[in-house]
C-alpha cells in the first residue's frame, strides 16, 4: 500500500463547480475561437458564476452510462464509494455540452449549414447516450443582432434551427464577435449555469429515487453512498446548506455500519472524507465553532477504531492526517478573514498531527522490525489490475469482499507483510518535521513563545533522528536561549544532552566543548556520575584525544563520528578556543569587584576576582587575564601557573588556579593608575580564564565586563528576595550570593591640602564693579607649583546670565561687553608650605537675580605611590551664590506749578518735573551727581542744577529733585512727547577710591502736550492781612491766531470785598496780552477763598472754568490784623 494513501484525493479537497464542456472551438488555429475561450477562462473574477469549462472535440467519448437497475433486491454492494466517482462528475461527465457553430442569420447556404449544425448536435447526443446532460448551441456571428422582434428572418431561422436540432428556444444562443465580447460571454455563462443547475437537480432526484428500493439489512453501504452523492451533487449545484445537511446524515450513517477488522479502514476512510466536507462547509458558512465541534466528535468516534494490531501504525497515520487536514482548513479560513485566538488556532491541530506521526513512527519501528533476510512478497499483493483501488479504504488483495471472515489467511498475512515493509521505507522524520514546522509557524504568529519553543525542541530531536545534525543544532541553540532566560533547567539539560550528541557525531570541537562546559555547570540537572563522564571526555578533548561516545547514539553514526574525531586530532590548526560565556551557564562562575567606586590617583587601585567551580571534581586552570578599557593596565593583572595536561583533574588544592567544587576562590590585584586617567572611568572589559595548555588544546572562557553568565541575573534576583538565613562561614570565605559585581571605578584627583576663602559684601548691585577677594593658603608638606586660578560665573547656567556677567582682575576699569564671564587658568606662581596669597576679582552683573560663581584652584605636586614617583595635579573649588539687586528705585512725576498731578501738560505753560530716588541697597550709596538731559522738544524755565550732589543714602532713604520745564507747541503728536533722560552717577560708599563711578540712565516718560486758546496767570502777594488792601493783577494771553471775544465776571466771596470790573466783555488780539487789576479787601483771617474769576470764550465753548483754575490761585492765607507796639511793650519784649 502506497504511503501517500493517507492524503485526501484532490477531487475531495477542491471546491466542486458545475462542469461544462465546449465543443466546436478550434482554439489553436482560429483566432476568433481562441478569443472566445480566453474570455471564458482567463482572469476570472470572484463574482463570476462557479463553472469549470473544458474544450473537447465534438465526437468526444464520454463515460458510458451503466444500465439502470429496476430492483435492488438481490444486489449486494461491494463497497461504499468508488474511487473514480467524484472525479467523473467533476471532470468527465458534464452537466452541459455546448456546441459552438459559426452561422449568421443571412447565411446564403443556410440549409446546408443548418443541417451540419444539427448533425453535430446529434453526434454529441449519441456520445452522451443515457445521460441527462443538457445540450445547447451557440451561434458565433460576425454582426451584432437586432433587438428581439425586429429581425423577422432571424426569428424564423432560429425556430427552424431549434426544430432541426431538437432543442428548446432556451438552449439556442447567439454570440456576436464584437468589442463587447466579455459582456456577452458573462451573459452566456449565467445561462449555462441555469442549465447546469437543472441537470444537478435532476441527478439529485434520480439518486433519491433509488433509496426507495433499499433495505437496511443488505444495503447499509448504499445508504451512505447515496447520501454522499446527494450531498456532492448539491455542492455542484452550489446549494451548500443542503449539501451540509446531507453530509451530516451520511456521516451518521457511516457510524451506524457494523465495524469489523476487515472493513474498519473503509469506514474510517469514508468518515474522514465526509468529516472533511462538513468542516469545510462550516468554515465556508462562517461557523467555525460548528466545524471544531464536528471535528472533536469525529475524533472521539474514530480514535478507538484501530483495526488490525499488526497494522496499528496505519491508525496513527490516519489520525495524523485528520488533524493535519483540519489544520489546513482552519488556516485557509483564517486567510479568508476568520479571526483566531491564542488558545484556538491551527497550530494545536498541526501539533497533534505531529504527535500521531511520532506515534506512527514508534509503532512502525516496533512492528516493521523484520530481519534483512525477509523479502518483499512476489507477486505484489498491493498491486491491482488497474493500478488503483475500486473503492476507497479497501485492501487491494480482497477488494469487494465484505465477509467478516478471512477466506484466505495466507494472502492476508502476505498483504500485511507487504504493508509493513513499505512502511519501513517511509521517511517518518520528514513528515513529522513538516507538521511541527507548520505548528511552530502558527504559534509564532499567535505569540505563543513557550509552545513554539517546545515544538522546536521536538523538531530538533527529529532532525537528530534523521541524522541532519546541523539543522538539529541550529534549532536547539535557538531554544536554549529561551530556556536559560526563563530558568527551565530540566528542559535545558535535556536539550543540551541532545545537542552534545549532535556535536559529538559531527565532531564539532567548539560546540562539543561549549555544551560540555554547560552540562557540568549548576544549570545542569544531570547526576554526578554523568557529569564525571562528561568532565573526563572534556579533558580528553583538551589533551587532543578522542572522547568516548555519547550514550544511546546510533551505532553506525558513532563509527562515522570516531573517524571524524580521528581526522580532527591529526589535523594541524589552531588549538585555542575562546568561548564567550555571557549567553550560557558554564561550570565556572566569575565575579569582579573593585574595592571602591573611586580611587584617588595617589592610592593603588585594588580589585578582587572571585571564582567558583560547580563541576564534580577539583580542576586546575592555567591562566587568568583581566582586560581593561585602558589596555596599558592589562599587563599588571595576569596570573599564570604552568601545569601538564594530565594534571588538570588531579585532586590538588595547592596553587591559586586550582578550584575546589563549591568553594570560592578570591584573587587580589592592584596597580597604580596613570595621572592621565584622572577624571576617567576604568572598566574591566573582560575576564579570560584558560583551561588546558597550548601543547594540547586550550579553552579560554571569556566573561564580558565583570563576570556573570546567562543565569546570574535571575539568581541575583532570587537571592535578593530570599529571607533564608545564610550559614556562618570562616573569615577567609564569603557567600557567593553576597558578592555584587562592580566592574568599574573612577580615578579621581589627589585630595588637595589647601584652603580657599572668599571675602565679599553681598548682595551685588546692578552694573557695579563688585569685589570678591580670593585667599589661597597651602597646607601641603612640600612646595606646590604651577598654581592656577579659574574664577567667574559657573558654567552651565542660563545663557542670558553669561551675556550679562563680566569678570576682570582690574577694578579700576569698567567692564564692557568684551570682558568674559569666566577667567581661566590665571597663573599665580608657586606656594611654599603655609604660604598664602590673595587675588581681587571684580564682577559686573548687568541684570538682577541669583548667580553662582566658581573659584577653582589647581596645582602640581610630586608624590610617591608604591615606590613610584608621580606628579599629581590637585584642585579645589569653591562656589558662592551672589544675589544681584537694583541699587535704587527712581520715581518720576509731572505736577503743575501748584504741585497738582498732571495727566498732560499745555504748550508754553510751565510745569514741574519731580524725581524721587529711593535707596534699595542694604549698603550706603553715594550719589555723586545727577543730570537732566532734556529732549529737543523740552525747554527749561530756569537753570538746571543737580540738587543731590554727594548725597549719601542709607537703606530706605530717598533724595528728591524738582525741575521747572515747559514744552513749546508741536501740534498733535501720537504717543506723547519725549521728555529726555535722568542720569545718576553713583558708587558704593564703602568702595575704594579707584573703583570707577557707575552711571545709571533713566529714560523719562513721554508726556501728552495740548494747546489751550487762552492762558491766565495771576500776580498776587504770598499772603494778605485783615483790613489791608490786597492788589491782584490777572494776565490774559491769547494763544491762538484768532481774535478772542472774552466775557469776564467775578463772583464775590464772603471773606473779601473787592474793587474793579465785576463783569466785562473785551477782545484780545492774537498773540497779545490783556491785564485786569483788582483790589481785594480781606475781612477774615485764615486760609480764605478768593473771589472767583469766571471767563467765557465765545469761539471756544469747551474752555471751562475748571481748566482755568489750574493756572490761577483760588485761595490765599490771610493774617490777622496787627497791633501798634509802643516803646514800653518793646522794652518788655
Swiss-Prot record:
Q: Modified residue N6-acetyllysine is at which positions?
A: 245
Going by the entry's taxonomy, the superkingdom of the source organism is recorded as: Eukaryota
Q: Mind listing the GO biological process terms from this record?
A: constitutive secretory pathway; COPII vesicle coating; endoplasmic reticulum to Golgi vesicle-mediated transport; Golgi organization; regulation of protein complex stability; vesicle tethering
The consequence of residue 1104 to A is:
Found in a patient with congenital disorder of glycosylation; uncertain significance
Name the GO cellular-component terms.
cytoplasm; cytosol; Golgi apparatus; TRAPP complex; TRAPPIII protein complex
Q: What is its main location?
A: Golgi
Provide the alphabetized UniProt keywords.
Acetylation, Disease variant, ER-Golgi transport, Golgi apparatus, Limb-girdle muscular dystrophy, Transport
In which compartments does the protein localize? Golgi apparatus; Golgi apparatus, cis-Golgi network
Q: Does the keyword Repressor apply?
A: no
Question: Which InterPro entries does the entry link to?
Answer: TPC11, TRAPPC11_C
Disease with which this protein is associated in UniProt: Muscular dystrophy, limb-girdle, autosomal recessive 18: A form of limb-girdle muscular dystrophy characterized by proximal muscle weakness with childhood onset, resulting in gait abnormalities and scapular winging. Serum creatine kinase is increased. A subset of patients may show a hyperkinetic movement disorder with chorea, ataxia, or dystonia and global developmental delay.
Assembly? Component of the multisubunit TRAPP (transport protein particle) complex, which includes at least TRAPPC2, TRAPPC2L, TRAPPC3, TRAPPC3L, TRAPPC4, TRAPPC5, TRAPPC8, TRAPPC9, TRAPPC10, TRAPPC11 and TRAPPC12.
Described by its record, this protein's role is as follows: Involved in endoplasmic reticulum to Golgi apparatus trafficking at a very early stage.
The similarity comment for this entry is: Belongs to the TRAPPC11 family.
State the protein's name.
Trafficking protein particle complex subunit 11
| Protein source organism | Homo sapiens
The gene from which this protein is expressed is TRAPPC11
